[in-house]
Amino acid sequence: MQKLELLYEGKAKRIYRTEAADMVWIEYKDSATAFNGEKKATITGKGRLNNEITTFLFRKLQEVGIETHFVKKLSDTEQLVKKVSIIPLEVVTRNVIAGSLSKRLGMEEGIPLAKPIVEFYYKDDDLGDPLVTEDHIRVLNAATLEQISTLREKALRINQVLIEHFASCRVRLIDFKLEFGITEEGKIVLADEISPDTCRLWDEESNEKFDKDVFRRDLGNLTEAYEEILKRLGGASHV
C-alpha cells in the first residue's frame, strides 16, 4: 500500500489517498492545540503516542464486536483505515462533571454522574463546534433521527467497554469525544481516534490528569502524561 497525495490536514492528523479507493492513510502529527486552535504547540512524540494508544483501543473495541474504520498500524505515527464519510457531529459521553459541563451547569469538577450524559456538537470550526440538540441536528441535516439514535447507542456501548478497561489500569474515564463515519456499504462505524487528546483520563486515586488538560491548563509535561496512559494500557510492545 502506497501513500499518495494529501487529501486533508487537520489540527492533529494528515490524511492521504492510497491506491485502494476504499482506504486512506492517516499520519498523526506532533502538534497540540486547545481552545479551538487559539493555543498551539509542537510536542515531539505526541503523534506516536496518540497512534499507539488509538491502535490499542480500537483493537480492543473490535475484539468485542464494535466496528471501526481501523485496518492496521503502519508505523509509529501512521495507520491504514477504511475510507468513510464523516458524520459532522462530535459525540461526547460524560461520566463525571468536568470541563465545559462544569462551567455550563455551575457544578464542581469531579462529581460522578448517576448515568452517562451523551451530547452532540456540530463540527464547524467557524462556529466553534457548538453544542446542538436533536432538533438542531435535523435543521442542519447533519444526521437523521435513526442515525442520532445509532450514534447514542454506539457511544454508550463504547463508554462501557472503555470504563471497564481503563478501570483495570487504575484510570477513571471522565469523558470523551467520538466521531463516526459511514462506509460505502452504508454502515456507521467508529472513526477518528481515541486518545488522551479526545478523552479526560484521571488517576483513580489522586485524580492526576493524563490527558490534554495537561496542555490546556499548563499542568506539566504532556508527553509524560500520555506515556503513563500507554504504559498502563500495556505499553507499545503490546500495540
Curated annotation (Swiss-Prot):
It comes from the Bacteria. GO terms for molecular function: ATP binding; phosphoribosylaminoimidazolesuccinocarboxamide synthase activity. GO terms for biological process: 'de novo' IMP biosynthetic process; cobalamin biosynthetic process. Its EC number is 6.3.2.6. Keywords: ATP-binding, Ligase, Nucleotide-binding, Purine biosynthesis. It catalyses: 5-amino-1-(5-phospho-D-ribosyl)imidazole-4-carboxylate + L-aspartate + ATP = (2S)-2-[5-amino-1-(5-phospho-beta-D-ribosyl)imidazole-4-carboxamido]succinate + ADP + phosphate + 2 H(+). The keyword Nucleotide-binding applies. NCBIfam families: purC. Belongs to the SAICAR synthetase family. This is Phosphoribosylaminoimidazole-succinocarboxamide synthase.
